[in-house]
Amino acid sequence: MKPSWRQCRKVTGAGGLGAPLAGSSPARGAGQARRAYVAPGPRGALGGPGCRALSSGGGGGGGGGEYKTHFAASLADPERFWGKAAEQISWYKPWTKTLENRHPSTSWFVEGMLNICYNAIDRHIENGKGDKIAIIYDSPVTNTKATITYKEVLEQESVPLAPGRDLDWDEEMAKAQSHDCVPVLSEHPLYILYTSGTTGLPKGVVRPTGGYAVMLNWTMSSVYGLKPGEVWWAASDLGWVVGHSYICYGPLLHGNTTVLYEGKPVGTPDAGAYFRVLAEHGVAALFTAPTAIRAIRQQDPGAALGKQYSLTRFKTLFVAGERCDAETLEWSKKVFRVPVLDHWWQTETGSPITASCIGLGNSKTPPPGQAGKSVPGYNVMVLDDNMQKLKARCLGNIVVKLPLPPGAFSGLWKNQEAFKHLYFEKFPGYYDTMDAGYMDEEGYLYVMSRVDDVINVAGHRISAGAIEESVLSHGTVGDCAVVGKEDPLKGHVPLALCVLREGINTTEEQVLKEIIKHVRQSIGPVAAFQGAVFVKQLPKTRSGKIPRSALSALVNGKPYKVTPTIEDPSIFRHIEEVLKKAS
């Protein structure tokens, strides 16, 4: 029996958020939605001395002419640019206004009506692609594999919400009646998704339907370079933003086959799992987190388990979620034998802020350490704490000049005051990403850490991410987190929590000496790096992020909060014990 898509996907449009659940029928809404053509409307203390100058993400060379044209057009006339992209989505009612600034939020495709389920499923069937494979379900956990066509998805996802608790699945499916797709306004909330909470309490991000559908459909080709029908795999948890955007909605909107993998990079059963899935299902592009690649490398440094698989259809590997250090990047290129492209985005944006837009001709061999160039629609800048633009390679606050493009969040659930305060008050006229980094002369962005993770060492602001990359480039360390430890003389000094790779026979004392020397050579004595402890594992969210704020509090003997998103909370106790022994 094939697994049901209903069992796998997140139910949206339910409860207080919106309309009744859209069900299915082969003829439901057929011919009602249409691609709307709308005539274009009117045009709509980081940093330091010596760093002030214009810094913006669209310039520089190496970007490809098509990318430059698209980026410039998206900023000069966003209404025309995104109105054109919206023609690729089917609308029940065309919008009356492409963009409306509501300070600080932005509304896109005002009064337009659509249904995202219709766009992701029904319209492909109406276009004669009902027998194409929509979902490949691969679960080493249950030893189940299945392919599900668009027609089968439609047939299986038409169960209305009903009160009750314990119900028999097959009985309910047998009784189910089909339901027409329900048109909703473009600004209608599609879902509430809570952030991973690595920088504080999780925040309920509210996602508008119309702009999200337009942006995701556009990114599948323009950012990720895929054609409809190709196999795409986002190796994420379905409950995180990558799962929502690029396991569920994005690939289905664009007509791609999406791989739904219920397993891990290691342990299900081994470090060859990713290679097996890529080969077996003919995956063209993979999106995963650097932490997954590090886990594979830690257990199988030579990728011996992956060598038995032929990856002839595999074209590109995309990574995001945590900064990808140069060592992990180069190892990935070597073992997967494809371009490996880091890019950067947030739960709040729902899609990439910066990337190598290979569908628009961006280079597939960008410099190591970067996270791409500004995606069209995102006017990324680097500012100091006084809102002065910084020169190339000066560390500062990464912000986005308003308006935000389609698909970005419209608010925080039941907390609009926090929405305004957290994201828009510090830098009026900009969206504050709360990340720190710099741009190079070519317009590539280097995201170094969260702003709170910049360590003040005797007046010098040092990026925790830069130290982490230096530590990880030493051949003995498989994973690392750097936090600031309070120091009576220097204010703070960096402390590294390190996980050694498998098979390292050198003593921890010797490794520590080598790491200190290595960091001193690569960053300089200004980092004042003198300390590291070795732990068996780092705490991470299920999306692969390290809760650095909690680790910082732990290291400094302060109360810390373990959020429900942490995969293994017991790791905190282990680190506490290691720190006690070290002191």
Residue locations for each model-derived region?
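Conserved adenylate-forming
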Residues: 155-167, 228-229, 254-257, 262-394, ...
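Conserved AMP-binding loop of ANL adenylate-forming enzymes
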Residues: 211, 216, 223-262
